[in-house]
Every structure is written in C-alpha cells, then in structure tokens.
C-alpha cells in the first residue's frame, strides 16, 4: 500500500500550495 502525505510549499506571504504525494 502507498504512504501518502501533504507536501506544502509557501509561494508568498499569504499563499500556500499543497499537493498529495504517494
């Protein structure tokens, strides 16, 4: 089975982008 987690990157002082990596 895959282990998944959220990878978040801060792209500005008020914005974040997140994606799920498996």
UniProtKB/Swiss-Prot annotation:
Subcellular location: Secreted
The organism's place on the tree of life at top rank: Eukaryota
One cellular-component annotation, GO: extracellular region
Keyword Secreted tagged: yes
Entry keyword set: Disulfide bond, Secreted
PTM comment text: Contains 2 disulfide bonds.
Expression (tissue specificity): Expressed by the venom gland.
Function, as annotated: Not lethal to mice by intraperitoneal or intracerebroventricular injections in doses up to 150 micrograms.
Record-given protein name: 2.4 kDa venom peptide
């Amino acid at each position: 089975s895959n282990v998944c987690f959220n990878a978040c990157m801060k792209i500005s002082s008020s914005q974040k982008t997140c994606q799920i990596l498996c």
